[in-house]
Amino acid sequence: MDTAMQLKTSIGLITCRMNTQNNQIETILVQKRYSLAFSEFIHCHYSINANQGHLIKMFNNMTINERLLVKTLDFDRMWYHIWIETPVYELYHKKYQKFRKNWLLPDNGKKLISLINQAKGSGTLLWEIPKGKPKEDESDLTCAIREFEEETGITREYYQILPEFKKSMSYFDGKTEYKHIYFLAMLCKSLEEPNMNLSLQYENRIAEISKISWQNMEAVRFISKRQSLNLEPIIGPAFNFIKNYLRYKH
């Protein structure tokens, strides 16, 4: 049996501003439209021969609505929930055939529904720093800038990269190691107005994002307590760096 550890790397940009109304540093966070567990299941990133506890844990980490969607056994609806109208027909066909082989052909989905019924609690939709996977031959910083614009609509001329800051964090989930690398940027004054409504201006730019907003450190701590991904160890040092940067700048 293949036990090799997989490494998945994402690169992100922590972009900050000083909110002049309350004199607090804020950063842009985006909320995913679906849970990581739901995405992993739909893309068949699991072993059908794994112990049932691993599969039940995957369903535990889905939202209630996602579990209900899987129980319909309607793969088209599940796929649409992630990809919407994105044309990825070859990938769809490959994943559908695997879903059909794993769950529909053996017993018409009875085992799958039984496993879902054993799930307890409910997962949450993650708030995270805008990030994504690097393209082939793409530098880390270029990837961070590209992904940030794709997820927020804010282009390169509106912020300044602070090259002295670069942090990474890793965590493990079964056979997969997830590594996130982050750069830091400071927003230019032309976009620092506290009333700038990112939720309305950039919402639904891409299929995977449902919300986008400015968050201060108190909000980051609150969010981190309610989800599996703890943002405080990365955003905390970034905010401290920004404080020192602003102190010496002025």
From Swiss-Prot:
Positions bound to Mg(2+): E138, E151, D173
Disulfide bond sites: none
Any Pfam family hit: NUDIX
Biological process according to GO: AMP biosynthetic process; ATP biosynthetic process; symbiont-mediated suppression of host gene expression
Location(s), subcellular: Host rough endoplasmic reticulum
Chief subcellular location: host cell
Catalytic activity: diphospho-myo-inositol polyphosphate + H2O = myo-inositol polyphosphate + phosphate
Family membership noted in the UniProt record: Belongs to the Nudix hydrolase family. DIPP subfamily.
Protein name (Swiss-Prot/TrEMBL): mRNA-decapping protein g5R
Source organism of the structure: African swine fever virus (isolate Tick/South Africa/Pretoriuskop Pr4/1996)
